[in-house]
């Protein structure tokens, strides 16, 4: 199937990005093989992993452009899990489309923008081309702050949000008919809208609040390209009154009225139609309330019975010399805007200074001109409204004001109060060069020669015309206006300034224009965040200020934490180091309170959007380290007030053990049924968790378990459905074998009955029943289900023996260890870390001043400096993928992914795992416990249901981490890097040595994984590997896990291969690192051979001598028990 077009994203001009590449050139090739690739990208198989992997494998620009366009349709949570690889490819495999995509997603998520900044900062410190990385980093920063679409972390305290309104001032302008759109004379004492250039918000006399920047009020009056198209092709569209209430402001503003014969209504008549309406129907009775906006405005300058002739264009009428004969109008006929624009110089006029109108302050000019005006209007409008509109730039150069041309707003900190009042709204938008007035007049004169079209329609054709590249012939009106495209430079200049979609700087073209000019085309990036949130957004100026503040304050917060860890290294002794840590945290807390004013500080880790409010100084813990000073802190956070709809709707996925998925939405999507061959559909979609081949399952059963006994059929059971009448008759029969009945209601509401008949087997004899001493069942339950886990928990709560678990251990009897354990002050139910996380959380919440606020939560992190933790981030990312692989296969192998956030090449934030303790700390705290089994017996009470459940959790986690340690060659596995949680799971941390590097450069830990005597004792085995139920369960889980990982070998290998040129210590082996990783998956072996392979790996790891010697070395050198 040939591919028609490729979508491409170009770094140069955002107005043309994404653009269509109409020439196929050599993208597809002669064979057209890439056509299948495009179909694959458009299928249901497409996900984040496919996008990232093909971005790495395919260097062709067309493929990368198409992939980046498709990535816009993927959820941000999935993209975030591969952000490390994406940023790495940005630096080492640059692509304009990839740069554009990363810049765009930085504007959609604050957490992504922060992580991109830190990832690029780490690469910036290593790379030689610092200018290119710094330029991308700056663009991402601008996209996240000035053009950000993410909701601010908090709202300003002095802002009141009104539901159903996007802007309070616009809402007031549109809804207040009496104050703004009525020609009735207002009393002198009427309260008017006041405007102030202060950066805050202004309170009206009647109590309502208004933003300060006047330009911000009208910035949305700039029509978008879609509105321009609607004006050209939908000029006379009929709309109901109900639809007019539901439609947006600009549709109601720019829509034409229903008909000229109907009675005009102010709200239903379009703004520009009233602006351009000719005075053809002079005899028609038009009331004050039905007159057009500008018609009423200009009525004081024209004749009372006729405004102008219909043949004159708009601007010619606007620029007409007002020296003509004008009749003196009385006070009752004064128009509304005439009163608003009345010169404030004359103190003896009817309106006093306190009643200055809203628009009067908008259009007020600070310096009067010396233009000559008739005496009739000298007291009313000295300079004239139109002269203010088209005032030339010569006085603007004297008062240079900095304007944000991207979104049409003027920041309060860059303008003084006099400049705010000096420049009116229309003056700013219609500001032109000195020859603009002449050009506009010439254009209007030229338009008079076109008699077929009305002057107002030709005006729209000139104003809202489409760029030649974007022009599409869809109607005869557009084809007839081809001559208007090549209009005068003055109009083109005017329009470029008004809509700012062509002549922009490089920064504007890539960042500021992307928000306005993304066009929806088939296959192009979809606007996923178009759905409005429940709360109205902030005005853009305030929102961008808050976004900018939150972005920079979050960066400074993390930098202060990391610099604290870096500075504590030089402080001795340790007691002074703890004092210095608390003093530094106190200073950080002071900055936290100040950051609340500028937008808050984002907590960059975990799910959801939270802002940091406080760090309890007394809860900080300085961790043990000889050369560095890592520390652990608890952080009080509050959930952001305006979370995105996607984050609030996504429920947190939990595993069987209650651990959230590390990858979240990044799961591989299940293809539709039609994508599979017919003979494999049922096999793929079956719900069974065991997906091994039949031969593999038979091999495991033959090696691990005895044959099951033969079942004896004792009874025959038959079911039948009868009508209510016949069922009742049979129910009355005393000679009936009905044991139970249940009513059932059919579709016709006739009552039916289900008859259950149980009869004994006539051919059964007592000799047929076997002896009760039959071989045991397969109690190891090769793939335990969630139901089985719940059975164990329920049985443990009742104090009964759970089904499917052995009652006695097959290993050594450790009953004599019970008094020693009790003597070590460890009691059943004691917390491993001294205090359970929930208890600590409740205690801190009660003591905190923020604890009663909604959305309060407590997070714990480790701040580490002095180490390059990018390798640690890669290891945790790989563990997350192994976790997802086991979850997709339905295997009970247990892993605990955690987050490592790299903030530079030598600093990082690490998520702490609550309610855990290392084996070393457990032995140190309870000196009378000499082995890990002693701890299990003391904590869970031997042979109790909780003890069996803890053993099961230990085995499932041991199997998962054993496979990970073998495949990734994780070293340095001493007891300080092995944690235990409250449920008995074992957790591995600290992945500084993996793949090809080892401690000291000597591969002393040569065993596939750590399986020492004390670990085997917990599984009811010993150093010789004596069979036991839990040890057999461990073997089966290792076999199933290894076979499942082989199916996803390319997924793991490619993820590592993407970073092989990064210079991480784990890649010091060069290309052999990837080759050896591939060999460890043994992709050439059959599944039966893999069973024998895994069993041999377990045998070689049983209490290996080198593993024991390494533990002894750590005990002697570092005191690790």
Swiss-Prot record:
Loss of function: phenotype: When associated with PI4KB2 disruption: aberrant root hair morphologies, and short and wavy pollen tubes.
Segments of this protein annotated with the region Activation loop: 988-1012
Region (Disordered): 187-210, 343-421, 435-489, 506-544, 794-825
Membrane topology value: Peripheral membrane protein
Composition bias type Basic and acidic residues, residue spans: 358-376, 383-405, 412-421, 435-445, 466-475
Sequence positions bearing Phosphoserine: 449, 454
Biased composition (Polar residues): 187-207, 476-489
Composition skew (Acidic residues), residue ranges: 446-455
Region 11 X 20 AA approximate repeats (PPC): start-end pairs: 212-508
Molecular function terms from GO: 1-phosphatidylinositol 4-kinase activity; protein histidine kinase binding; small GTPase binding
Catalytic activity: a 1,2-diacyl-sn-glycero-3-phospho-(1D-myo-inositol) + ATP = a 1,2-diacyl-sn-glycero-3-phospho-(1D-myo-inositol 4-phosphate) + ADP + H(+)
Region (G-loop): 841-847
Residues in PI3K/PI4K catalytic domain copies: 835-1106
Protein localization: Cell membrane; Golgi apparatus, trans-Golgi network; Cytoplasmic vesicle membrane
Domain text: The PPC (Plant PI4K Charged) region is involved in membrane targeting and phospholipid binding.
Descriptive protein name: Phosphatidylinositol 4-kinase beta 1
Species assigned in the record: Arabidopsis thaliana
């Amino acid at each position: 199937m040939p591919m028609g077009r490729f979508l491409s994203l170009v770094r140069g001009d955002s107005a043309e990005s994404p653009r269509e590449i109409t020439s196929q050139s050599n993208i597809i090739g002669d064979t057209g093989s890439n056509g299948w690739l495009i179909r694959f990208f458009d299928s249901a198989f497409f996900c984040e992993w496919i996008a990232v992997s093909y971005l790495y494998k395919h260097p062709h620009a067309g493929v990368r452009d198409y992939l980046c366009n498709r990535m816009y349709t993927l959820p941000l949570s999935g993209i975030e899990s591969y952000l490390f690889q994406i940023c790495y490819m940005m630096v080492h495999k640059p692509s304009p489309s990839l740069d554009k995509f990363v810049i765009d997603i930085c504007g959609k998520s604050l957490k992504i923008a922060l992580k991109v900044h830190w990832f690029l900062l780490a690469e910036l410190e290593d790379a030689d081309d610092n200018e290119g990385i710094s330029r991308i980093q700056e663009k991402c920063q601008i996209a996240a702050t000035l053009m950000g679409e993410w909701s601010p972390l908090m709202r300003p305290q002095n802002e009141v949000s009104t539901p159903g309104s996007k802007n309070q001032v616009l809402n007031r302008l549109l809804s207040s008919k009496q104050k703004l759109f009525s020609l009735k004379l207002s009393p002198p004492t009427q309260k008017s809208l006041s405007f102030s250039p202060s950066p805050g918000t202004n309170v009206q006399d009647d109590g309502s609040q208004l933003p300060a920047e006047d330009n911000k009020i009208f910035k949305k009056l700039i029509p978008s390209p879609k509105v321009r198209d609607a004006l050209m092709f939908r000029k006379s569209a009929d709309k109901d009154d109900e639809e007019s209430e539901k439609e947006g402001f600009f549709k109601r503003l720019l829509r034409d009225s229903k008909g000229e014969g109907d009675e005009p209504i102010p709200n239903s008549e379009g703004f520009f139609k009233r602006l351009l309406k000719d005075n053809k129907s002079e005899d028609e009775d038009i009331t004050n309330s039905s007159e057009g906006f500008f018609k009423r405005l200009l009525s004081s300058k024209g004749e009372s019975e006729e405004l102008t002739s219909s043949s004159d264009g708009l601007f010619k009428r606007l620029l007409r010399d007002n020296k003509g004969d004008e009749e003196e109008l009385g006070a009752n006929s004064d128009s509304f805007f005439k009163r608003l624009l009345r010169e404030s110089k004359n103190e003896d006029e009817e309106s006093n200074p306190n009643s200055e109108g809203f628009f009067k302050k908008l259009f007020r000019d600070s310096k009067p001109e010396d233009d000559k005006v008739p005496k009739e209007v000298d007291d009313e409008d000295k300079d004239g409204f139109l002269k203010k509109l088209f005032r030339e730039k010569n006085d603007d150069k004297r008062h240079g004001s900095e304007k944000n041309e991207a979104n049409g707003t003027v920041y309060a900190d860059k303008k003084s109060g006099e400049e705010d009042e000096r420049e009116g709204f229309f003056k700013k938008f219609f500001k032109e060069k000195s020859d603009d007035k002449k050009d506009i007049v010439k254009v209007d004169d030229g338009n008079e020669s076109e008699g077929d079209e009305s002057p107002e329609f030709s005006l729209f054709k000139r104003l809202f015309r489409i760029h030649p590249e974007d022009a599409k012939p869809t109607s005869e009106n557009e084809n007839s206006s081809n001559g208007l495209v090549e209009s005068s430079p003055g109009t083109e200049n005017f329009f470029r300034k008004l809509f700012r979609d062509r002549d922009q700087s490089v920064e504007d073209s890539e960042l500021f224009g992307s928000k306005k000019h993304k066009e929806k085309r088939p296959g192009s990036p979809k606007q996923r965040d178009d759905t409005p949130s429940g709360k109205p957004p902030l005005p853009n100026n305030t929102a961008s200020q808050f976004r900018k503040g939150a972005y920079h304050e979050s960066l400074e917060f993390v930098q202060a934490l990391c610099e604290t860890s870096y500075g504590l290294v030089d402080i001795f002794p340790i007691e002074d180091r703890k004092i210095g840590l608390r003093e530094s945290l106190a200073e950080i807390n002071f900055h936290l309170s100040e950051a609340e004013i500028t937008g808050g500080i984002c907590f960059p880790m975990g799910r959801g959007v939270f802002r940091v409010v406080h760090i309890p100084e007394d809860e900080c813990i300085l961790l043990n380290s000889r050369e560095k000073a890592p520390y652990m802190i608890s952080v009080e956070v509050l959930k952001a007030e305006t979370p995105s709809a996607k984050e609030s709707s996504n429920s947190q996925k939990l595993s069987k053990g209650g651990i959230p998925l590390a990858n979240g939405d990044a799961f591989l999507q299940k293809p539709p049924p039609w994508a599979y061959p017919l003979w494999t559909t049922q096999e793929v979609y079956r719900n069974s968790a065991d997906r091994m081949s039949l031969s593999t399952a038979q091999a495991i059963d033959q090696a691990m378990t005895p044959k099951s006994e033969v079942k004896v059929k004792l009874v025959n059971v038959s079911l039948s459905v009868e009508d209510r009448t016949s069922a009742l008759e049979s129910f009355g029969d005393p000679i009936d074998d009905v044991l139970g009945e249940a009513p059932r209601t059919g579709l016709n509401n006739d009552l039916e009955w289900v008859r259950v008949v149980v009869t004994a087997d006539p051919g059964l004899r007592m000799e047929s029943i076997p002896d009760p001493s039959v071989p045991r069942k397969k109690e190891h339950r090769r793939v335990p289900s969630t139901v089985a886990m719940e059975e164990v928990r329920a049985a443990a709560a009742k104090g009964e023996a759970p089904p499917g678990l052995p009652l006695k251990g097959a290993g050594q009897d450790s009953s004599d260890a019970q008094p020693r354990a009790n003597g070590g002050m460890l009691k059943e139910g004691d917390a491993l870390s001294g205090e359970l996380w929930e208890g600590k959380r409740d205690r801190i919440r009660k003591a905190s001043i923020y604890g009663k606020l909604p959305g309060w939560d407590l997070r714990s992190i480790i701040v580490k400096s002095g180490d390059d933790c990018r390798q640690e981030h890669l290891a945790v990312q790989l563990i997350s993928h192994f976790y997802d692989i086991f979850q997709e296969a339905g295997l009970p192998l247990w892993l605990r992914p955690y987050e490592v956030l790299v903030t530079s090449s030598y600093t990082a934030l690490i998520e702490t795992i609550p309610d855990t303790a290392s084996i070393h700390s457990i032995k140190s705290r309870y000196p009378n416990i000499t082995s890990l089994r002693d701890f299990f017996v003391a904590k869970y009470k031997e042979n109790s249901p909780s003890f069996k459940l803890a053993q099961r959790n230990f085995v499932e986690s041991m199997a998962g981490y054993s496979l990970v340690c073998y495949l990734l060659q994780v070293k340095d596995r001493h007891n300080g890097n092995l944690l235990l949680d409250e449920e008995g799971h074992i957790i591995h941390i600290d992945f500084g040595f993996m793949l090809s590097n080892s401690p000291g450069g000597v591969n002393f830990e040569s065993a596939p994984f750590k399986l020492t005597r004390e670990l085997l004792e917990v599984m009811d085995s010993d150093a010789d590997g004596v069979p036991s139920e839990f040890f057999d369960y461990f073997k089966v889980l290792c076999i199933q896990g290894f076979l499942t990982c082989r199916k996803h070998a390319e997924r793991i290998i490619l993820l590592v291969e993407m970073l092989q040129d990064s210079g991480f210590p784990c890649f010091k082996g060069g290309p052999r690192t990837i080759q050896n990783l591939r060999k460890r998956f043994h992709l050439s072996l059959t599944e039966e051979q893999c069973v024998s392979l895994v069993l041999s790996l377990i045998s070689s790891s049983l209490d290996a001598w080198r593993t024991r010697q390494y533990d002894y070395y750590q005990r002697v050198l570092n005191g690790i028990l």
